[in-house]
Amino acid sequence: MTTDTATAVTSSPEQPSPSTHGPLFRFLFVHEVHDYPSNGKRTGYLGLAVLATIVLYYTYYTQTGVTPNILQGYHMSFSFYVWIVIVSNLIGAFASLPAGKTDKLGRANVIIYGLLVVGLLIAVGVPNVHGKWGFAIVISAVGLVEGAILVATPAMVRDFSPQLGRASAMGFWTVGPVAGSLITSVVATQTLHHFVDFQSQFIISGITAIATFAVCLFFMKDLSAKLRDQLMVSAQDQALVEARARGISTSEVIAATAKPWRQIFKWDLIGSSLGISLFLLVYFAAAGFFTIYFSTVFVNSNGSNFSVSQANGLNAWFWGADAVALIIFGVLSDLLKVRKPFMLVGSVGGIVFLLLFSHQASNAHTPYYHLVVVEIILAAFLSLAYAPWMAGYTEMVEKKNPALVGTGLALWGWVLRLTVGISFIFLPVVIHAVNPVVNNQPLATQTIPGTNTNAQSFLSEHPASVAFATDHAAFLAVLNEPKNVPVVSALAADPSAANIAAAAKALGPVNLAMVVKYQTQLKTLVVPYSKELNYLSANQAQLTALQNGVKQSPKEWQNWFWVCIAGMVLFIPTVFLNRGRWSPKRAREDQAKHDADVARELGELVGAKA
């Protein structure tokens, strides 16, 4: 590191010293350490930042584990639900911009009190709203907080991770959103059938956030401004960083943070942020809508759609693989000291396996574990690109000004949420078969009164009865008229001359002839299943809409996956905006030169103070 690679701190000189405040204020709002922590403590602080990220995203994604239940419970259309997601993302986008102020104010308070606010909104707010508009308001408020935390948590991870361990650390941070989705799926799978309604999922996640708030209030720490706003490439830089921090002047503080957006709002950072946002369209589709996708497109061997629990089980496999792969590829990227090769291979592999994943929708009977294998490999390729990208992006920001990492992450958060929000505007245009499927699914899955089966199973198990009833609907409608039922029943029990005459008078000669003609079919296909067939007839319009929606849904989802594939393709050119090396050998040479520069500069500082 040369003498001009580190930049001074961002804490405002007008900011009062913590010593001027009482002990209660310091306990609640002052969470700084003034010496770079040892490896053990640093790992603990990183762990808390990751834990907070996991819990915050668990609460944010709670709705995705019970989306079909929410649509049914609030009588909400799929389009309305998507617009809630859009508004929440757009609010989060603009909330991320002022979150860049964490460069001056620190990260810890945003995270700690963000946990408290989100916990209360989720645990108390959602269970106590009774309509779709109330739900929309609460989720939008959660999006506001999430947008700020999207900036604060990776900034804190950067503060406690030198560049040589950055991809590993960012791999752990990106586990946060992924693990949040994983926990959502696992908890829903294990608990949803134990509780009366979907609100239980929000209560569980909200209480978890409040408990995590209490832990972070006691133990989460920020680096002091003078430490966090310098560039640290390796753990061996610690002595140099601390020596500089003690010698930073107020004028250097002001110069380092003058006009932050003018320093950060550059085409390479914007392009890189836009590229990864497009690449992650499939990630956000998975996080927000895979529960609906799996439960409306795929069916079991008996013809019934995958249940919400089965869909969450598939989600758990996807997110679990994603989480493990993020850590593995982050560590590998640090060991090889390169980012761009991982990003390029991950994007190409992601395109190939998203094509394969999309193709599975063509067969509604695709086996459950076949889907598991394909989605695990897809998740691995997404992680292969994303963890190194996060590390590379923070390093790009540090090259411009290490004192403005929070501002750089605010730019990324703004572009990410804005891109996702705008793209989702078109989701209901591409996918519009969800409403008839979700709205009418209960009619197909609930038990038919007086029987031990449901419409979906009956349609699958008794196609001959359904076909006969459909082809002779007008004839059977005459037989089922209330005034004709006793006559038909008497004729079936005793085909005497008197009963035949009564039937001829009630039904007419044409219908009586049909009774005689189809007496075998009536006895074997209709009479034993009269309750089931009457149920199908009474709900024919809704069940027909459901069947049409099921037929249309796979193609519509495949169209959206093509949009996601296009986003991945557009990401590839932005890989070249990253300033890192392609060759591990050249990267090792850069590190050797950096180590020599650090030793020389530290010697100069020590000599100057001697």
Spans of model-derived segments:
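Conserved MFS/SLC helix-loop-helix module at the cytosolic interface between two early adjacent transmembrane helices
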Residues: 94-130
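Cytoplasmic membrane-interface "Motif A"-like loop-to-helix N-cap segments
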Residues: 104-115, 334-348
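Juxtamembrane intracellular "pre-TM" segments in multi-pass secondary transporters
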Residues: 19-39, 224-273
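C-terminal ends and interior cores of transmembrane alpha-helices
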Residues: 116-130, 348-365
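A late C-terminal transmembrane helix in Major Facilitator Superfamily
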Residues: 402-435
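Helix-loop-helix hairpin linking two adjacent transmembrane segments in secondary transporters
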Residues: 173-225
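Cytoplasmic helix-loop-helix junction between adjacent transmembrane helices
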Residues: 138-176
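Extracytoplasmic gate region of multi-pass secondary transporters
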Residues: 63-65, 265-319, 386, 390, ...
